[in-house]
Regions:
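Short hydrophobic alpha-helices and adjacent helix-cap/hinge residues
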Residues: 1-324
């Protein structure tokens, strides 16, 4: 065999593994949210940043399949089953509820799952413990029930004369929030009225009841459905001239009075970081469930003026951002 033929054959043999690598399919990630694509846009950007920190870029070396329920909790289980059927390498589930079918699917999935939930995942049986989740599940736990005491305290500081506080709550959520709120309001000497709402019409009805209940303020709890209706809820609070506190800054940006909650963007970045680690071989059950460490108070001075409210100096001093 002539030397040129030998060199050609060797060169071709050397190129085969490179060609094989180039033809390998991109890893696939499933993303399921209880909100809408529009509502999740900023959080998804943070999620992609976290993936990027691990070396994964959507469209380049990673594919992502998205599913959104647009605030309709009843669709979560069906859409998760659909994603599981697509057999991605990892699935992100945002807005985990206490719905038994959804929890059972997540616990028994052979595909690693990274969640974002406001409920205690140990109490709901989703993980064995926060430090050692076990199984095939891990994620971010915001434990919103623990923020309720702070939020109610802020309302009390804003309106010292308040006697009755209303609480807007989605009954599809865990019962931890109203139970925690009842304990806190009892200690503060306040009456708590829980208003259930999980549809547009129920939101309108809930706010219409505020005058009848003589509520001095309202606490709007966390809910993917509520977040998709942030503008509507902020407008209702303005219409009925009731001071409101929210968990997320998006409500304040939509015209709400004030919010106190965790830094959602940092949490979603960490979801991306965890997803990248799992794609590289880490087991979900070995990764501890993370909790937020960054919190922020955002106030809307324009809304306060419209309501005839003046933020006390103490609240102004600790606010992370004031929207004018």
């Amino acid at each position: 065999m002539r030397r040129r033929e030998v060199v050609t054959l060797l060169g071709g043999a050397t190129a085969w593994p490179f060609a094989a690598r180039a033809q390998q399919p991109k890893p696939n990630v499933g993303y399921l949210s209880g909100r809408s694509a529009e509502t999740d846009a900023a959080m998804l950007a943070a999620f992609r940043r976290g993936l990027g920190e691990g070396g994964y870029v959507e469209g380049r070396n990673l594919a992502i399949e998205y599913r959104f329920t647009d605030g309709r909790y009843e669709r979560m289980a069906a859409l998760l089953a659909e994603l599981i059927g697509r057999k991605p390498e990892v699935i992100i589930v945002v807005g985990v509820t206490a719905e038994p079918t959804l929890l059972r699917q997540m616990k028994t999935s052979q595909i690693p799952i990274v969640f974002v939930t406001g409920a205690d995942p140990v109490r709901t049986g989703l993980v064995a413990s926060l430090n050692r989740p076990g199984g095939n599940v891990t994620g971010i736990c915001t434990l919103v029930s623990e923020m309720i005491a702070k939020e109610l305290g802020l309302l009390r500081e804003l309106i010292p004369s308040a006697k009755t506080i209303a609480m807007l709550w989605n009954p599809h959520n865990s019962s931890e929030e109203p139970n925690e709120a009842r304990e806190v309001t009892a200690k503060l000497g306040l009456q708590l009225n829980v208003l259930n709402a999980s549809t547009d019409s129920e939101l309108n009805d809930a706010f219409a009841m505020l005058d009848h209940q003589r509520a001095n303020a309202i606490l709007v709890t966390t809910s993917p459905f509520y977040l998709t209706k942030a503008k509507q809820i902020a407008a209702l609070a303005a219409q009925y001239r009731v001071p409101a506190i929210y968990v997320r800054r998006e409500y304040v940006e939509a015209g709400g009075l004030m919010s106190y909650g965790y830094d959602i963007f940092d949490s979603y970045r960490l979801v991306g970081v965890y997803s990248a680690r799992i794609l590289k071989g880490d087991k979900a059950g070995d990764l501890p469930v993370l909790q937020p460490t960054k919190f922020e108070l955002v106030i809307n001075l324009k809304t306060a003026k419209t309501l005839g409210i003046t933020f006390p100096p103490g609240l102004l001093a600790i606010a992370d951002e004031a929207i004018e």
